[in-house]
Curated annotation (Swiss-Prot):
A Pfam family recorded for this sequence: RNA_pol_Rpb2_1
Protein name in the entry: DNA-directed RNA polymerase subunit beta
Organismal lineage: Bacteria, Bacillati, Bacillota, Bacilli, Lactobacillales
Bias-annotated ranges (Acidic residues): 1183-1215
EC number: 2.7.7.6
Length: 1221
């Protein structure tokens, strides 16, 4: 009997799973994080924004513009058409507005076009200008009130408070070394804290003391805050002090000061806590959290019956709080109303809730705890009650009452998803539009004006376009494979507008926090400067209405202490109140705990507790990690650094032409493929009637016919092949949501990123030194690791000042053989095989020539002769871009295509490359065990097993111990056993096969029980000295392929200032020979080599031209001249006012070349090319005389080709020369 149990993943794959924990909660849809948020935006978000900004009234109150409703019309293009036409997939938005004229009572209602709103595709992406993009969710600090504490150099704890709104002015409180409290309003200079309280209308010291009670800090602060101007009351003076900080130097009155403070904090248009901010403020200042653990200094009674709830001296524990909880929510329980003076900011009574407790430090000292009362959730502004309660919390922190906040805690960080980001952007646009509307209301005639005339939609359209086009959070979708796509949609970034910047982010914010458990993956994050700032959402995490991450837990019954199937989703700050056991905790059949003492989590500690103290238990072990990390088998046996690499490598796997699912999987592959959006899913139950490569037809049970069209060989964002293949056959029964066609990198409905080669951990003639990989030629011959790459090239025919460019077959100075694959219009035919430099689209551009005379113009009009000079600007295949032409698309204005201004015709050519695995390509397993291919050996030379099976890949065993990714060893043993048994297995993360399970499985499969085998050398037939670990590991080919990186340069472009070659493949640049490389040549005394590298091959402008000339003529190369960089240095010093001259050995001044005067030294390589051409022709003529007539024909063809090359070179160098001048 084999270990494990059989699990079906979809309709087409069965695996033997080693999991022990039953999955009681299905995985949520993995792209909901995007789609649900956008749905909320359309259903509620848009209305919210309009309700925030509208109604708009003019200053005199004659006209009011109100929002009624909005609707989206049908999109102009479908998703596929948007891709093809480089358009945005969007729908026109029409808003119904109502304009009321209060003088006449007339109401005008009108539908106004508000621009196009980009729509989300079914899979959660957007198509903007033909490219698929994803809006990444942002992890930001939540609005709310935060308390901090740090120790000064004397060891005293200094506290601070920040009230952060969603938008608007910040309010900060702080203490100094003398224990005086200060306030900063909107990050200005500080004022004594009492000034803010006085500005609320509580002017006298006695009023302030009555509200806050006695405290040393408060007394010192009041002493500091002296009455400077007896002419003003204390309230008026306080208002003016704040005005002075916000607008220094401006004349101030009590009224202007009051209205400024009102507009900063109490005007909903300028200050917004948002629903989440109000929730956080209410929660932080509520007495429920603050009373726990303190002794009451007064008796609490029921306001209706007078029954004592808790007597004075009672310690408030959880049981007492259960009694008080409902009373604390009542408006008539322990509430106190304070009446401010009429001069205050808001002269209305302030109601707060107060309860007295005893201090812990001085037991007989009474402390007053003040909460902000019961402020409704829809109050988005801060209120005087909030300010009083937050000041009280701040003052009581000095007495040791209350907690300071951890800003990296996920209870204090929230997620802004697509819907909210888009809503904020729309709000910015509408706020800009509001100003325009107000202006137009005052200018235009009230009797005749319509809503349409008041509205200017440019700011709204502009802000939405700007967001999708250039925001840091709007990213080009990673479309390497379905896993990369899915991960991109679930990514959480702390960067972006309103977030952190990577330069200022410290270690704390990047580090894994205990609240990440089940919410953010502790493993998957990029290596490099963004580490820890970009995270991935955990598999089971969801986002609540406030934007906080929640993770599910199974409830443990308080009565029976047994685990129930009741699921609760908890936010990070709710979880802090509970003790939680791990999912692997042993349970009895009835749900009770096996052990008497259980290791659990409480906040950041691991605690050992008895079962009666446990509140919750994890749902499943994989809830801790992200989708990508959950695809790594034996993750628990890998070091975290390598696990991080393994997760990142899977996203870089290239889709292969014949992928296979992993023999050793985790069970996550099916859901990853299903939810990625790349698989084709059945929309209803039914039976398959027809299948071919392009479409599948399914007859539903109600007899309607669904036709599904498959994507064939489309270029993905990452220039990979996006192709769907059927996963069903005729007569199959399908169910709703079933995978009926695999996407790229999928097989049998599962994610299939690589292949299952036979791998041996052995060295082989030093070829796999330092992470190099040795492959068998079988992998090349049988196309095991072959992938298809599709690149597109565009050629635009524009209007120029000298006339329109023309797409034509008649290209000057190009031989007939270069045009053999072009059609009559000069466009390459589909199916043609093209190589570097071949013409794809023939195009000519008018050259700048003198104006034609009247006679020439007449001749031209009559005979239509080509009197005009044109130059060849054809689209050619770039270096390394050769392949087969897959498709050609032509867009013209005549056909009604939308083209960019000035473009008459656009031709797009798609070229396909079939890339086999080759030396230099990067490969990796799922455990961060990456390497590059160093040798592809013939199959007969590869080491082979006793049964004659040759090994496919040899990896260096030295790559394992120091890296500590032992998961790969367990994987090869399990893989070998699975291959021997002909089955697929699943070993879920943290709940998979143990080491004992692996060895049992290996023994049952009948292979060597130590996982090793005798290996024979393929060249000699001799066995290797030691037994070798051999098995099957899932191995991937990554996107870093040598074909994209290999590059060589002979003649190319130069930098204008330094005259040195440019760098990089894209610029056709040279190789940098840096300071350390110069030292190396100096060390070897290689003077001549060094000299030519620093002169001819770099920036000796005259010398390099003369060297080229000498090579062409076959002469000796002259001595090098002065490098251009020396001249630049001299000019730099001269520009600083230093009179610097260069002298030769005889102390005569050397004149340095001046670019503008000495244009001859900028020798044109054209002349040299022509010289080379002439010599070539002469040579050919001599050969022609000697050889026979058949060879003559051949010779002329060569000459044509040489001529075409020389002309191309001439055009190129002429352009370069012009640029450098």
């Amino acid at each position: 009997m084999l270990n494990g149990h059989v699990v079906n993943y979809g309709q087409h794959r069965t695996r033997r799973s080693f999991s022990r924990i039953k999955e009681i909660l299905p995985l949520p849809n993995l792209t909901d994080v995007q789609t649900e948020s956008y749905k909320w935006f359309l259903d509620e978000g848009v209305k919210e924004v309009f309700d925030d900004i509208l109604p708009i009234s003019d200053t005199s109150g004659r006209l009011t513009l109100e929002y009624v409703d909005y609707k989206l019309q049908e999109p102009k293009y479908t998703v596929d058409e948007s891709r093809k036409h480089d358009a945005t997939y969007s729908a026109p938005m029409h808003v119904t507005l109502k304009l009321t004229n209060h003088e006449t009572g007339e109401i005008k209602t009108q539908d106004v076009f508000f621009g196009d709103l980009p729509l989300m595709t079914k899979s959660g992406s957007f198509i903007v200008n033909g490219a698929e993009r994803v809006i990444v969710s942002q992890l930001v600090r939540s609005p709310g009130v935060y308390y901090s504490g740090e120790f000064d150099k004397n060891g005293r704890q200094i506290f601070g408070t920040t009230v952060i709104p969603n938008r608007g002015a910040w309010l900060e409180f702080e203490t100094d070394a003398k224990n005086i409290s200060y306030v900063r309003v909107d990050r200005t200079r500080k004022l004594p804290l009492s000034v803010l309280v006085r500005a609320l209308g509580f002017g006298s010291d006695s009023e302030i003391k009555e509200i806050f009670g006695d405290s040393d800090t408060l007394d010192l602060t009041l002493d500091k805050d002296v009455h400077k101007n007896p002419a003003d009351s204390r309230v008026a003076e306080a208002l003016k002090d704040i005005y002075d900080r916000l607008r220094p130097g401006e004349p101030k009155t009590t009224d202007s000061s009051r209205s400024l403070l009102v507009s900063r904090f109490f005007d909903p248009r300028r200050y917004d806590l948002a629903a989440v901010g109000r929730y956080k403020v209410n929660k932080k200042l509520s007495l429920k959290n603050r009373l726990l653990g303190y002794t009451l200094a007064e008796t609490l009674a029921d306001p209706d019956t007078g029954e004592v709830l808790a007597a004075k001296g009672t310690v408030v524990n959880n049981e007492v709080m259960d009694v008080l909880k409902d009373y604390l929510d009542r408006d008539d329980f322990k509430t106190v109303t304070y009446t401010p003076s009429d001069e205050g900011v808001i002269p209305e009574p302030v109601t707060v809730q107060e309860i007295k407790v005893f201090s812990r430090e001085i037991p007989d000292r009474e402390i007053k705890l003040i909460s902000n009362g019961h402020i409704a959730e829809d109050v988005k502004c801060i209120t005087p009650a909030d300010i009083i309660a937050s000041v009280n919390y701040f003052l009581e922190l000095q007495e040791g009452v209350g907690n300071i906040d951890d800003i990296d805690h996920l209870g204090n960080r929230r997620i802004r998803r697509v819907g909210e980001l888009l809503q904020n952007q729309m709000r910015i646009g509408l706020a800009r539009m509001e100003r325009v509307v107000r202006e137009r209301m005052s200018i235009q005639d009230a009797a005749t004006v319509t809503p349409q005339q008041l509205i200017n939609i440019r700011p709204i359209v502009g802000s939405i376009k700007e967001f999708f086009g250039s925001s840091q959070l709007s990213q080009f979708m990673d479309q390497n494979n379905p896993l990369g796509e899915l991960t991109h949609k679930r990514r959480m970034s702390a960067l972006g507008p309103g977030g952190l910047s990577r330069d200022r982010a410290g270690y704390e914010v990047r580090d894994v926090h205990y609240t990440h458990y089940g919410r953010l993956c502790p493993i998957e994050t990029p290596e490099g400067p963004n580490i820890g700032l970009i995270n991935s959402m955990a598999t089971y995490a969801i986002i609540n209405k406030y934007g906080f991450l929640e993770t599910p837990y199974r409830r443990v019954s308080w009565a029976t202490h047994k685990v129930t199937d009741k699921i609760d989703y908890l936010t990070a700050d709710e979880e802090d109140n509970y003790i939680i056991a791990g999912a692997n905790t042993p349970l009895n059949e009835d749900g009770s705990f096996v052990d008497d003492v259980i290791l659990c989590r409480h906040r950041e500690d691991n605690v050992e507790v008895s079962p009666d103290r446990i509140d919750y238990i994890d749902v499943i072990p994989k809830q801790v990690v992200s989708v990508t990390s959950a695809c790594i088998p034996f993750l628990e046996n890998d070091d975290s650094n390598r696990a991080l690499m393994g997760a990142n490598h899977q996203r870089q796997a290239v889709p292969l032409i014949n992928p296979h699912g992993p023999l050793v999987a985790t069970g996550m592959e099916y859901r990853a493929g299903h939810d990625s959006g790349d698989a084709l899913l059945a929309e209803a139950d039914g039976e398959v009637e027809y299948v071919d490569a392009n479409e599948i037809r399914v007859r539903r049970e109600d007899q309607t016919l669904d036709t599904y069209t498959l994507e064939k060989y489309r270029r993905s964002n990452a220039t990979k092949n996006y192709n769907q293949t059927p996963n069903v056959k005729r007569g199959d029964k399908v169910v709703d949501g079933q995978v009926i066609a695999n996407g790229p990198s999928m097989a049998d409905g599962e994610l299939a990123l690589g292949q299952n080669p036979v791998i041996a951990f052995t060295t082989w003639n030093m070829y796999n030194f330092e992470d190099a990989i040795m492959l068998s030629e079988r992998l090349v011959k049988e196309d095991v690791y072959t992938s298809i790459h599709i690149e597109d090239y565009d050629s635009e025919a524009r209007d120029t000042k000298l006339g329109p460019e023309e797409i034509t077959r008649e290209i000057p100075n190009v031989g007939e053989d270069a045009l053999k694959d072009l059609d009559e219009n000069g466009i390459i035919r589909i199916g043609a095989e093209v190589h570097d430099g071949d013409i794809l689209v023939g195009k000519v551009t008018p050259k700048g020539i003198t104006e034609l005379s009247a006679e020439e113009r007449l001749l031209h009009a009559i005979f239509g002769e080509k009197a005009r000079e044109v130059r060849d600007t054809s689209l050619r295949v770039p270096h390394g871009g050769g392949g087969v032409v897959q498709d050609v698309q032509v867009f013209t204005r005549e056909a009604g295509d939308e083209l960019a201004p000035g473009v008459n015709t656009l031709v797009r050519v798609y070229i396909v490359q079939k890339r086999k695995i080759q030396v230099g390509d990067k490969m990796s397993g799922r455990h961060g065990n990456k390497g590059t291919v160093a040798l592809i050996a013939p199959v007969e030379d590869m080491p082979y097993l006793p049964d004659g099976t040759p090994v496919d890949i040899c990896l260096n065993p030295m790559g394992v111990p120091s890296r500590m990714n032992i998961g790969q060893l367990l994987e090869i043993h399990l893989g070998r056993a699975a291959r021997a048994l002909g089955i697929h297995v699943a070993t879920p993360v943290f709940d998979g096969a143990s080491e004992d399970d692996v060895w049992d499985f290996v023994r049952e499969a009948g292979v060597d029980s130590d996982g090793k085998t005798v290996l024979y050398d393929g060249r000699t037939g001799e066995p290797f000295h030691n037994r070798v670990s051999v098995g099957v590991m899932y191995y991937l080919k990554l996107t870093h392929m040598v074909d994209d990186k290999i590059h060589a340069r002979s003649i190319g472009p130069y930098s204008l200032v330094t005259q040195q070659p440019l760098g990089g493949k894209a610029q056709f640049g040279g190789q940098r020979f840096g300071e350390m490389e110069v030292w190396a040549l100096e060390a070897y005394g290689a003077a001549y080599t060094l000299q030519e590298i620093l002169t001819y091959k770099s920036d000796d402008v005259v010398g390099r031209v003369k060297a080229y000339e000498a090579i062409v003529k076959g002469e000796r190369i002259t001595k090098p001249g002065v490098p251009e960089s020396f001249r630049v240095l001299v000019k730099e010093l001269q520009s600083l006012g230093l009179d610097l001259r260069v002298l030769d050995s005889d102390e005569n001044e050397v004149e340095l070349r001046d670019m503008d005067e000495d244009s001859n030294e900028h020798v044109n390589i054209d002349a040299l090319s022509r010289l080379a051409e002439a010599q070539e022709k002469k040579k050919l003529a001599e050969e022609e005389a000697e050889i026979a007539a058949e060879a003559e024909a051949e010779g002329s063809a060569e000459e044509d080709a040489a001529e075409a090359d020389a002309d191309a070179n001439e055009a190129e160098t002429a352009d370069d020369d012009k640029a450098s001048k």
